[in-house]
Regions:
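Accessory carbohydrate-recognition regions in carbohydrate-active enzymes
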Residues: 1-217
Length: 217
C-alpha cells in the first residue's frame, strides 16, 4: 500500500505526485515506484469535496473543470509514514498514512451541508481500469474490485501488458447516510488509454452519467 496525492491521470506520472502541478485530483492507494514508461497503478482514488457534485476530476491545466482542487504548498507536511495538506478549493485538511496492509485517510471538513467523499474506481495512471465492482456491506463499509488490462492503457500505454486486479475493503468512520454510484456508457469501439481517457468526448460521457441511488451494488 502506498497512499499518495495524485496530480494527473494522463501522461507519465507513476509516482502519482508531481511538484510542478498546482492541483490534486485525489489520493490513491497504489503507486508504481522506480519505473517510467507512462506509469500505472494509482488505483482507488479518494477525494473529499464540498458543494455541487462534480463527476470528473477535470484537467490539470484547468481547461476542463472538475472536482480536483488547488492546494496550499505551505501547509504540506511530508515525512516517513505521514502526509498532510490543505485543499484550498474546499478548505479541507487531508491527512494520510499507511500500514503494511492498509491505507488511512482522515479528512477535516469545514461546516457544510454538502460534504462528501468521492471514490473513482475507474481511475488509473496512464489509462483506466476496464471493469469495476462495488458492494455496500453496511452503513460503514464497502468492498469490491477493479480489473486493469492492457486495453485500459497503463504501463507503456498498454504495451507493457500490465494485467492485474485490485481488491479493496473500505471502512468509514461516519455512516453512509446518502450515497450513489455512476457508471458511464463508453462505446465498445472507443480506445480507453492514456490520452483518450482525458479527451473531451470521454470526459463528457463520464460527466453526463446518471447517479444511481438506493442500490447496494
Amino acid at each position: 500500500v502506498q497512499v499518495s496525492p495524485n496530480t494527473i491521470t494522463g501522461g507519465d506520472n507513476g509516482s502519482g505526485y508531481s511538484d510542478e502541478h498546482k492541483t490534486i485530483e485525489g489520493f490513491a492507494f497504489t503507486q508504481m515506484s522506480g519505473v517510467g514508461w507512462f506509469g500505472d497503478l494509482g488505483n482507488f482514488l479518494v477525494m473529499p469535496t464540498t458543494g455541487k457534485l462534480q463527476k470528473i476530476a477535470g484537467k490539470e491545466d484547468g481547461s476542463i473543470k472538475g472536482y480536483r482542487s488547488a492546494y496550499d504548498k505551505a501547509t504540506e507536511i511530508a515525512k516517513a509514514g505521514y502526509y498532510s495538506v490543505e485543499l484550498t478549493d474546499y478548505k479541507i485538511k487531508v491527512e494520510s498514512s499507511a500500514t503494511p496492509h492498509c491505507g488511512i485517510l482522515q479528512f477535516t471538513f469545514p461546516s457544510s451541508e454538502q460534504s462528501r467523499i468521492q471514490i473513482d474506481l475507474a481511475r488509473r495512471v496512464g489509462g483506466t481500469s476496464t471493469s469495476q465492482y462495488v458492494k455496500v456491506l453496511d452503513d460503514h463499509t464497502i468492498q469490491g474490485w477493479m480489473k486493469c488490462t492492457p486495453d485500459g492503457g497503463g504501463w507503456g500505454n498498454g504495451e507493457g501488458n500490465s494485467d492485474y486486479t485490485v481488491y479493496y475493503y473500505a471502512q468509514f468512520s461516519k455512516p453512509l447516510s446518502n450515497y450513489g454510484f455512476w457508471s458511464a456508457d463508453i462505446p465498445d469501439d472507443w480506445v480507453r488509454k492514456r490520452d483518450e481517457v482525458v479527451s473531451i468526448p470521454y470526459l463528457t460521457r463520464v460527466s453526463q452519467a446518471p447517479v444511481i441511488k438506493d442500490k447496494k451494488e
